[in-house]
Amino acid sequence: MELTGNIKVMMDTKEVSASFRKRELVLTTEGKYPQQILVEFTQDKIGLLDGYRVGDQVRVQIDIRGREWQSPRGEVKYFVSIHGWKIEN
């Protein structure tokens, strides 16, 4: 899948654990009803963001990932994340 828009926010790299890093950006989509979409780049894909800045018009190739989580009380919740794997002007 692909998202097109302007970079609204570019966050710093986060060290989530000793073996996992991620960097997030917020992309403002185009169209009649623009959306603010949070896209994660992880591990070796973080370097793809080097050279891009807030305000840049970009196309981002994404995967949508979902997961299930169960609380200690047995409640089940579902989470969705958007992972970027390619970015270009």
Where are these regions (language model features)?
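Single-stranded nucleic acid-binding surfaces, predominantly the OB-fold ssDNA-binding core
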Residues: 1-89
